[in-house]
Amino acid sequence: MARLAGVDIPREKRVEVALTYIYGVGRTRALQTLRETEISGEIRVKDLTDEQLVSLRDYIEGNFKVEGDLRREVAADIRRKVEIGSYEGIRHRKGLPVRGQRTKTNARTRKGPKRTVAGKKKAR
C-alpha cells in the first residue's frame, strides 16, 4: 500500500479511485490532481513510479486541507456554531438535521431509534 497524506491507499485500484480514500479528496479533486500532475487516472497505484507518488503527495498536501487538518477544521466550525447559539448550532446540540430536512417523519439517522409514546387511555 502506498501512503499519501497519512493514508494507505489500495495498490490494486486505479489512481483516480484510490485517491478518494483520502478524507477531503473526492472524484473531482482526484481528477484535478491527476490533471495537474500529468498522471493518467487509468494507471494502477502499484504501477506508479516513486516520482509520480512524490508529485501526488506534494500536490495534495500543498493545495488541499485533508485528513486530520480538515476534520479539525470541520469540528471547530461546528463547535463555534454551538457556542454562539446559531440555529445550526442548536440543531447540532439537539442532534437533529441541520440543513432544513423534515423531521415529522424520517430523520431517524440523526434522531436515533423510534421512542414509542403511549396513546390515549380508554375511560371506564
Curated annotation (Swiss-Prot):
Gene Ontology terms, MF aspect: rRNA binding; structural constituent of ribosome; tRNA binding
Origin superkingdom: Bacteria
Keyword Isomerase belongs to the record: no
Keywords on record: Ribonucleoprotein, Ribosomal protein, RNA-binding, rRNA-binding, tRNA-binding
InterPro entries tied to this protein: Rbsml_uS13_C, Ribosomal_uS13, Ribosomal_uS13-like_H2TH, Ribosomal_uS13_bac-type, Ribosomal_uS13_CS
Start and end residues of each stretch annotated as Disordered: 95-124
Cellular component GO terms held in the UniProt record: cytosol; small ribosomal subunit
GO biological process, alphabetically ordered: translation
Oligomeric form and interacting partners: Part of the 30S ribosomal subunit. Forms a loose heterodimer with protein S19. Forms two bridges to the 50S subunit in the 70S ribosome.
Family named by the database record: Belongs to the universal ribosomal protein uS13 family.
Function: Located at the top of the head of the 30S subunit, it contacts several helices of the 16S rRNA. In the 70S ribosome it contacts the 23S rRNA (bridge B1a) and protein L5 of the 50S subunit (bridge B1b), connecting the 2 subunits; these bridges are implicated in subunit movement. Contacts the tRNAs in the A and P-sites.
Stated name of the protein: Small ribosomal subunit protein uS13
Species name: Leifsonia xyli subsp. xyli (strain CTCB07)
